[in-house]
């Protein structure tokens, strides 16, 4: 199966702030589309999960936290306006100047949460079938089960490592992702260097 996807790129912004709520992805997407309405109409756009540390009062941001938006190259000029902007995701954040980062192929990639069934066997079988439909041969390792919850909205799934990828298949998955809810950080892959770190 061949699918047409646009060439993608990562727009990277340093983020200043102390913490974010556990359900911050919903408010973050709302803020981003408020500031850059062009983002709202393209389902291929994804927002990578922020690197955080859990605490009793929310999720703490490290000093070098970064917001990464994966989007078609054609839309990259629109997000330049995010530089220096404040964001309200339940706690205040501010973005520094952004830069563009090329997406490179890696044989092993990882997604923090891929949306799907809440049963691991069903989840793995569904993703294996999806990869087969794409003509991709690779190995899967399902990790931790987790959920995103915001009121009545609930997104379930597992973290996922895909390894033994050919370069062209890696780029396809890095560009297109797997599953739904990319705007909330789901199904977006990044390089993963040590498989044992999953456990």
What are these regions (language model features)?
Residues 1-199:
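RNA-interacting cores
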């Amino acid at each position: 199966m061949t699918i047409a996807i646009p060439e993608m790129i990562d727009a990277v912004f340093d983020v200043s702030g102390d913490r974010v709520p556990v359900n911050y992805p919903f408010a973050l997407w709302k803020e981003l589309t408020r500031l850059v309405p062009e983002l709202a109409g393209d389902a291929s756009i994804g927002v990578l999960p922020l690197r955080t540390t859990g605490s009793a009062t929310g999720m703490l941001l490290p000093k070098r936290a970064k917001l990464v938006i994966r989007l078609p190259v054609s839309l990259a000029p629109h997000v330049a306006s995010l530089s220096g902007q404040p964001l309200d995701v339940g706690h205040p954040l501010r973005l520094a100047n952004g830069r563009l980062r090329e997406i490179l192929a890696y044989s092993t990639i990882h997604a923090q949460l891929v949306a799907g069934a809440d049963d691991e066997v069903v989840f793995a079988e569904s993703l294996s079938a999806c990869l087969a439909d794409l003509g991709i041969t690779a190995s899967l390792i399902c990790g931790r089960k987790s959920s995103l919850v915001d009121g009545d909205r609930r997104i379930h799934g597992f973290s996922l490592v895909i390894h033994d990828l050919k370069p062209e298949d890696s780029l396809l998955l890095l560009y297109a992702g797997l599953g739904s809810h990319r705007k909330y950080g789901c199904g977006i892959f990044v390089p993963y260097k040590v498989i044992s770190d999953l456990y």
